[in-house]
């Protein structure tokens, strides 16, 4: 097939590489950057409290992309903001399907998406001493259609090379996040939605979800975390591919709910995220069947991880 969102598999890639200039109250950045929308995705992978982010966050987020971003320089501003424009496809010629971090072939027909964020400091205004409210929005300008065989990304007319799709999981993504902490206790709550979800058959247009994640630092080394997540949308919820998803179950469902219990051990008190051991147990339940009458996964998953950052 020609002119599809597809690319060759290479053994090298850049995850992030950018130039940043702080011009007083405004900071400018250009290069390959992670578009930071939704609370869990805004958090670095080295600092997340669970072994994997929530399912709907992973479904709606984009990969790192080449783009341009501006934002307020001081993270302590009462009102914060950010805006960016990003490429949708990275890649060169080829026919492979695995690597999604290939460097870009710059072409205006690659199309793009935009992101915007507003945040407001709610510290001392609610029940936690330090807190912030975030509103994220992303809009994707790419035109796509239904393609059940390779899960989306209709042929692009006149497109001279293939490219792996890197953009958002829906044409429009909205997320409202509130994060707060007081002492050793932290809480993150998030509601999000994706409108016109890509890669699904007709009728699976929209998806909605909520995440609630409290955590508590018992000692400088030991931390406990609980997460409840729910995602719903008519045959539009995409399951994880790395952990809970099993080939004997459908990759989509109408509704998913999951409860995660985890414990993290930080090896170095002075730099907690430099090296840590994470253990988590999660029960997930799905409702509905896909077009082939296959059910999604319902059951337990157990994971242990050693994560480093240096």
Task: Show the residue positions of the predicted features.
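Outer membrane beta-barrel
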Residues: 1-91, 110-125, 210-236
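Outer-membrane beta-barrel pore domains
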Residues: 6, 127-310
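Weak global preference for isoleucine
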Residues: 26, 30-33, 37, 48-51, ...
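Short alpha-helical interface elements
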Residues: 44, 51, 55-58, 95, ...
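General secondary-structure edge motif
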Residues: 50-51, 98, 158
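Charge-dense, low-complexity intrinsically disordered segments
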Residues: 57, 105, 165
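Loop-centered beta-sheet repeat module
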Residues: 88-150
């Amino acid at each position: 097939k020609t002119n599809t969102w597809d690319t060759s598999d290479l053994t090298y890639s850049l995850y992030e590489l950018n130039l940043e200039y702080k011009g007083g109250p405004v900071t400018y950045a250009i290069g390959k950057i992670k578009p930071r929308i939704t609370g869990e995705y805004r958090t670095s992978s080295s600092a997340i409290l669970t072994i994997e982010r929530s399912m709907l966050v992973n479904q709606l987020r984009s990969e790192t992309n080449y783009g341009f971003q501006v934002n307020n320089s001081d993270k302590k501003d009462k009102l914060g903001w950010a805006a960016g424009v990003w490429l949708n496809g990275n890649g060169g010629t080829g026919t492979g399907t695995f690597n999604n971090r290939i460097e870009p072939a710059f072409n205006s027909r690659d199309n793009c998406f935009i992101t915007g964020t507003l945040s407001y400091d709610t510290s001392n205004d609610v029940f936690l001493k330090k807190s912030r409210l975030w509103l994220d929005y992303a809009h994707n300008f790419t035109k796509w259609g239904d393609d059940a065989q390779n899960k989306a990304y209709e042929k692009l007319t006149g497109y001279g090379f293939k490219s792996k799709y890197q953009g958002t999981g829906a044409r429009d993504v909205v997320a409202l996040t509130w994060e707060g902490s007081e002492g050793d206790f932290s809480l993150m709550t998030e509601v999000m939605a994706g409108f016109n979800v890509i890669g699904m058959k007709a009728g699976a247009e929209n998806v909605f979800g909520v995440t609630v994640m409290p955590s508590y630092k018992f000692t400088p080394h030991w931390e406990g975390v609980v997460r409840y997540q729910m995602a719903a949308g008519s045959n539009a919820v995409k399951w994880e591919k790395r952990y809970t998803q099993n080939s004997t179950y459908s990759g989509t469902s109408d509704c998913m709910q999951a409860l995660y219990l985890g414990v993290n051990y930080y090896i170095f008190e002075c730099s907690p995220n430099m090296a840590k051991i994470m253990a988590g147990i999660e029960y997930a339940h799905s409702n509905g069947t896909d077009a082939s009458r296959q059910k999604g996964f319902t059951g337990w998953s157990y994971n242990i991880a050693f994560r480093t950052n240096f």
